């Protein structure tokens, strides 16, 4: 894709999200989502092959259905309230329709089927945008309507998402699919806290974006797409591979690393609201995520993958991809836990 075209498309994606974030009118919010969806499709189809075409079509159909449901929710709200203003007091039926539309856009269970398939069919750079930037707009709408959302509906979806995000990733060897299932689980954690403390949800989203962004940047740097190709990067770039493995554990929520902060805070908030069963269930199912990340780390770091290739050293030309953002992102994604006492300002 030529640079001017790419700049125009990326700026449309960004402006679409910004319109959703800043608008106080439902029609403008809907237009922002449509701009964002239509601009992201050329980015997904950057590598023009059948798999990318299929992934883009799946993405388009899902997002178009979600936009239709959103517009239906907006119209129902308009009929009952007579106003287009984005407000916290929505009609219950309109609120349910909008919640389902946003969860479809986010890829929460039971509307999660498109996420792994689309992520697997597109390049790493497109997957990075899909699993980070594209989550901001739907979550901002959920944040704005959080007081009128049906808590039981959201909690059911959250629990299912964390379960499916854990189970789905167990037998995967493709790194993009592993990150897609991880995304489903993280979205589950975010919507679990939505109706109780939306500020913690924003903190969780920031941490998730930092960790996923860093993971994708490191995968792009090493050109790793499978667990086998990741295990071969030990010989080529041992330092970067070790960073990837620590990041994987952080994404799984292992305590000394940054990924533990949002899970800790969400469990704390839920128990403050006298909920015991749900945070226990979320904590247990989060172990599934941690298990497949630990298994990936163990297999890559301490064992040799079965491979027909006897020569483990990859041919490599003298080229380095300059990524100035990587060092600070790696530090934030792994070493933020000591700063947790400062989080008390959120209360």
Curated annotation (Swiss-Prot):
Cell location: Mitochondrion inner membrane
InterPro entries from the UniProt entry: Complex_I_Subunit_2, NADH_DH_su2_C, NADH_UbQ_OxRdtase_chain2, ND/Mrp_TM
Key words of the record: Electron transport, Membrane, Mitochondrion, Mitochondrion inner membrane, NAD, Respiratory chain, Translocase, Transmembrane, Transmembrane helix, Transport, Ubiquinone
Bilayer topology term: Multi-pass membrane protein
Segments traversing the membrane: 3-23, 25-45, 59-79, 93-115, 149-169, 178-198, 200-220, 242-262, 274-294, 323-343
EC number: 7.1.1.2
GO cellular component: mitochondrial inner membrane
Top class in the EC scheme: translocase
Catalytic function, reaction form: a ubiquinone + NADH + 5 H(+)(in) = a ubiquinol + NAD(+) + 4 H(+)(out)
Molecular function GO labels: NADH dehydrogenase (ubiquinone) activity
Main location class: mitochondrion
Any one of the GO BP annotations: mitochondrial electron transport, NADH to ubiquinone
Its job: Core subunit of the mitochondrial membrane respiratory chain NADH dehydrogenase (Complex I) which catalyzes electron transfer from NADH through the respiratory chain, using ubiquinone as an electron acceptor. Essential for the catalytic activity and assembly of complex I.
Family note: Belongs to the complex I subunit 2 family.
Subunit: Core subunit of respiratory chain NADH dehydrogenase (Complex I) which is composed of 45 different subunits. Interacts with TMEM242.
Name this polypeptide is given: NADH-ubiquinone oxidoreductase chain 2
Organism this protein belongs to: Nandinia binotata
Taxonomic path: Eukaryota, Metazoa, Chordata, Craniata, Vertebrata
